[in-house]
Amino acid sequence: MTDFNAIDLDEGTSKGSPSPEKRDAEVQQLAKQYTQQSASSIYGQNPFCADAGSALDPNGDNFSARAWCKAMLQLQTEDDKAHPPRTLGVAFGNLNVHGFGSDTDYQKSVGNVWLQALGLLRKALPGQRQRKIDILHGLDGLVEAGEMLVVLGPPGSGCSTFLKTIAGETHGFYIDKASHLNYQGATAKHIANDFRGEAIYTAEVDVHFPRLTVGDTLFFAARARAPRHIPGGVTINEYAAHMRDVIMAMFGISHTRDTIIGNDFVRGVSGGERKRVTIAEASLSMAPLQCWDNSTRGLDSANAIEFCKTLRMQADINNTTACVSLYQAPQAAYDNFDKVLVLYKGRQIYFGPTATAKQYFLDMGFECPDRQTDADFLTSMTSPKERVVRPGSEHQVPHTPDEFAARWKDSTERARLLGAIEAYNAKFSDGQQLDKFRQSRRAQQAKIQRVSSPYTLSYTQQIQLCLWRGWLRLKADPSITISSLFGNSIVALILGSMFYDLNGDTSSFFQRGALLFFAVLINALGCGLEMLTLYAQRGIVEKHARYALYHPSSEAFASMLMDLPYKILNTIIFNLILYFMTNLRREAGAFFFFLFVNFILTLTMSMFFRSIASLTRTLVQALPAAAIFILGLTMYTGFAIPTDYMLGWAKWIRFINPINFGFESLMVNEFHNRDFPCVNFVPSGLGYADIGSGNQVCSTVGSVAGQGFVNGDAYVESLYDYTNSHKWRNVGIIFVFMIGLMFVYLAATELILEKRSKGEILVFRHGHSALTGKSHDDEEDAGGRTVAMAEKTESDDLAIIERQTAIVQWKDVCYDIKVGKENRRILDHIDGWVKPGTLTALMGVSGAGKTTLLDALATRTTMGVISGEILVDGKQRDESFQRKTGYAQQQDLHLSTSTVREALTFSAVLRQPAHVPRQEKVDYVTEVIKLLDMTEYADAVIGVPGEGLNVEQRKRLTIGVELAARPALLLFLDEPTSGLDSQTSWSILDLLDKLKKNGQAILCTIHQPSAMLFQRFDRLLFLKSGGQTVYFGDVGENSHILIDYFVRNGGRPCPPAANPAEWMLEVIGAAPGSHTDIDWFSTWRKSPEYARVQEHLQELKLERSQLTDLARTESGQKRQNKADYREFAAPFYEQLCEVQYRVFQQLWRSPMYIYSKTVLCSSSALFVGFSLFRSPNSIQGCQNQLFSIFMLLTIFGQLIQQIMPHFVAQRDLYEVRERPAKTYSWKAFMVSNILVELPWNSLMSLIMFLCWYYPVGLYRNAEPTDAVTLRGAQMWLFIWAFLLFSSTFAHFMIAAFDSAENAGNMGNLLYILCLLFCGVLATPDQFPGFWIFMYRVSPFTYLVSGMLGVGLANTHVTCAANEYLHFDPVNGSTCAEYMEAYRTTMGGYVLNGDATSDCSFCPMDDTNAYLATVSANYGDVWRNFGIMWVYIVFNAVAACALYWWVRVPKGKKEAVETGAGAEAQKKTQNGSA
């Protein structure tokens, strides 16, 4: 396995620490000579055919990236067919970038979101202009091919915008027309369109398919950019595999090749390794111009330096150009760059060689403190608090950004730069270089690819590659596919058994129609969950499109093809079971037509749902739209509302409904040219035994008097207006829909991008604004500190910090987890302690187990076995330990809708001891805000990255949330400076120093400390790979104690100017390119320092244990206050009140969620109501009113799909941050989330009632009974119960599942069963005996029965013209006389009672008779309502029970734990930092 630490980027020569003194000098010299000779002998070799173990073998330990690059370049140069290498420099002049909007925004809520709509309307009016916000002001610069530019500036200074502009990604902002960009003769338009993948921007976030392995992810990227002709005689797949191996070796991730990448919720590689995968993927684009935005975030300093060295090597050998923003740049990283750009609030204050940048500001009157890196010094110019002014120069130096920019514009350095830019523009003004660039690009592209296309592969090649990746993704995670197949098979079996062996007579007519209706719906609408999958991958696909790896539409087309086998298999299994179990038409042609129509309907509706997902930008937008369309497609299929009953205003819907055409074809396929014996004649029974056939008629629609059968064609034509001549015509129409929707889907994937953030803006609640302690001008006028200034005095705010006395110690701590069948040790016998008033650093390479150790000490592991001894004041930890410690996690996880003050107050109220008055807790929060300098944005909304708090503000809030809890024991911080610039990191350490001086005990992991930052720590716990201790002890002034230990044990001396934090990594062989033969773990265990640690641990244990026992003895009791030892500080009632208030507040501030629910409920109700507007009380009219209820229930699936993703987001926050901190219990979390839906569902039920009940006209049925008000109230209660049931059912489903998709599959299965067995599609007497229990347990049975009873009971029925049965009475009788006996027994009425021929008989005279046919009774209304509440309560209780059983960790943390909740944990799973 190739390790990142073993990669040699400098021709195989070692830059690591020397061997111990005992090593023979001659052996070193011989080894050096051998390495040089082997390096010089490989340049003529083919790198694809390198000898195993040579410097060109990426899978060997001797791999040299520099040697490989040179050999590859030589191979390309010697091959005439290879594309000539491309280079791309850039010159920019007067670069101005602006956006539109405001520096601050207000938070949208349910109450004020309409103000935004009014604002948008006002902006659309003529003469109204948006406010212009300048982002970059007049930048000039030149980065030639083969040069590297480092961009420095604090967050918000415009670094990201500059890099995006250079890479041609200008979404959301605009470049002024007067700006000039020259890419060696190409314009910005050329770069953005024709050469998109030649200039790439890599963001600092890591977005990948989590289930794919690292090797497959990088092979895909290499294959997508593989040139047409490959030198060296290898195939394109061999080329891609080799490039993958090389790039993995370069970035030290070869050992992760077969490990899935993972993400925050799926276990995979460590965070640092995932960052390197992102870097490697971008590098494989082979772009000649690369823009890297803080890509070293999450890497330790050694790997950050190695990243910069790799870019340097690529620039030297391949002439690539790199622009890199770095927030924390070690000196060794900074020295790799040629030029530096310093930005100060969007203004350029320096551009030029890195070697002279420092001197430029020194000459201006500033001073650089000792051991401060050049990059930190340059960035400090943008911070009035950090820049140091030389005594006597206070009035000469610039103070504000504008003054710095003006000083730059008047400088000789800028004049030289402008001259260089002018020469560059003149050099590339004739277009020759652009033509050469285009020719080189063309030589790399596939032959059939368009010349102007930014993509390398042809469209068909892209589809093939995406198909391969789709297959890998399916293999890696087949759970959704398998669960869908399983679920549909179960539904087919249930549906088949429900309609088992239908009779071949007229008694099965309605059942056959209902069966075909439900079958076509399940086939057509089963693809609805594809929307969730598409949204999950959208960000990844768009990133790859920016890298010009493939068209988004090619991935879309490939995913369609990839789903085909599943769709074919699903169609065959489902329809085969259904068709033959139910005794549908037993003819081969009819069966295969049935199969074929359902298959093309599945494909068509798949395109439909994919189109909705691609045309919308968020899932919240997509779900209501999908719900309305599904409702329309279902209602206008022709079964729920026959054609003759469709109202004129909506009749056109059936012509754009592919399901309508499919249903018609299936109905005529089943009924055409078949005669069905009649089983029910009118009149019949006692007194009618001897009448002739002409005196009675079959009771089925389409019958003819005197015939003992009903013709199938007559039936479907009379009832549905269907004809057999439309059978194949409809198939053609469905095909047209499928092709049309497919093109809509493919076009939408190319044209409509995912919603992106607006940029970093503060968001306040409406009516609130920023508070500033002092004016902006005052801050800038301060100009910086002087050398003579005394260190500023500590704030009185320190007095508020809880002074600690307890000592936390640990000895022989080990942590083992099970990987497969083997146990893997993550932590290996670690010792240490943290005392009050000390700041201890926990350091080590990525994967050394730093975060795992924090989790183990803080009792936050969710799996594995912890052994060893962890004590607090000599005693074992109790249940209250977790809430008495503060743990600031690396990920800044907060509720996005809360304000800063609210987040701090929530933590304080629930985590501080219960005996502290609430007002005192609130006052304490105000003091914490002052201490953390958050007053300016204390009332700002946290938001999401980009729209809300910036990185620094989030980090301060993360620390503040823990301080607000007043941790009594210890403060853990995991990477508090990760992603921050050096000045902000310094301010965070200032804060930690304040806390330390007031007695706070702090243990802090840190990745990239500068020498000055490192010096601020008192003690160091240093780990190596495998979780083994290398050193634990004091750091000492100028790190002399630490340095002395390593030098004394064989390490090379530390140069005076070196950063000890980087030097010690090199000494232990953990830095890339370094090597050591010393086993530093064994050295530590044998050292006198280790012995002293063991002695002191024993002393601490005895001393602190005795003091604790003495204190307890003096108090006269073992536990003075039981509340101090409880698991949670606040009692359950207080937890529930606080959490309930916050959850309700969150929904109020999530208007998209509430209004999407409102739109779904209101529009669905209106659509159903007006589609069946004032439905008459005919037989079919009663059926329509029944189906209006049934159709209203079909939004159930969309209701639960809205709730489940929302719940998952809340659960992740709770399980990752709030549950481990013991902020509140899982019971409060579950109950609050269930109860918060109640008021909104109450409101929705009222809206649904008004929008549906009155348009359908059900109130008219209550008028004859004088109970209009009562029955209206009863109907509202049932709708209310339906929405409450939907909400609690959604929580019941998602409680145990990790993803909304899997919960949705299970929910859909149960939902379909509820619909099947509710008595609408088949009455209870038609069920096989086995299934009658399902009718009784289906909640929809009581819902439909109750609503139908309330809506239809106790009124008259008047038959429609086609519902009257026509026959002649016996001779000598009137129609009334002839039907009297039958009517008395069976009901009904005669329209023309006095007639003696052609009697018109309606078989039903009141709605109660109709209710009896569907087993509904108005007398059961209150019983049914009560049963619905039983189901609601059951759902809520079951949701809580399931959550406890599956996701709540149980037992001691020191024992083997369940993996419940592990998917939500962001840390510890991998045992990596």
Curated annotation (Swiss-Prot):
The membrane-topology field of this record reads:
Multi-pass membrane protein
Listed InterPro entries: AAA+_ATPase, ABC2_TM, ABC_trans_N, ABC_transporter-like_ATP-bd, ABC_transporter-like_CS, ABCG_dom, ABCG_PDR_1, ABCG_PDR_2
Example GO CC term: the record gives: plasma membrane
- Residue positions with a glycan: 62, 294, 319, 1371, 1470
User: Short name of one Pfam family for this protein?
Assistant: ABC2_membrane
- Where is it chiefly localized? membrane
Looking at the record, which segments are called Disordered?
Answer: 1-27
Where does the protein end up? Cell membrane
Please verify whether the record's keywords include Calcium. Answer: no
Name the UniProt key words of this record, in alphabetical order. Answer: ATP-binding, Cell membrane, Glycoprotein, Membrane, Nucleotide-binding, Transmembrane, Transmembrane helix, Transport
Domain (ABC transporter): residue spans on this chain:
115-370, 808-1050
Query: Which SMART domains has this protein been placed in?
Result: AAA
Which residue ranges traverse the bilayer?
Answer: 480-500, 514-534, 560-580, 589-609, 622-642, 733-753, 1153-1173, 1189-1209, 1234-1254, 1277-1297, 1312-1332, 1425-1445
Describe its function. Answer: ABC-type transporter; part of the gene cluster that mediates the biosynthesis of the sesterterpenes ophiobolins, fungal phytotoxins with potential anti-cancer activities. Acts as a specific transporter involved in ophiobolins secretion.
Question: What family does the database annotate?
Answer: Belongs to the ABC transporter superfamily. ABCG family. PDR (TC 3.A.1.205) subfamily.
Classification via PANTHER family? ATP-BINDING CASSETTE TRANSPORTER (PTHR19241)
**Name of the protein this chain belongs to:** ABC-type transporter oblD
- Species whose genome carries this gene: Emericella variicolor
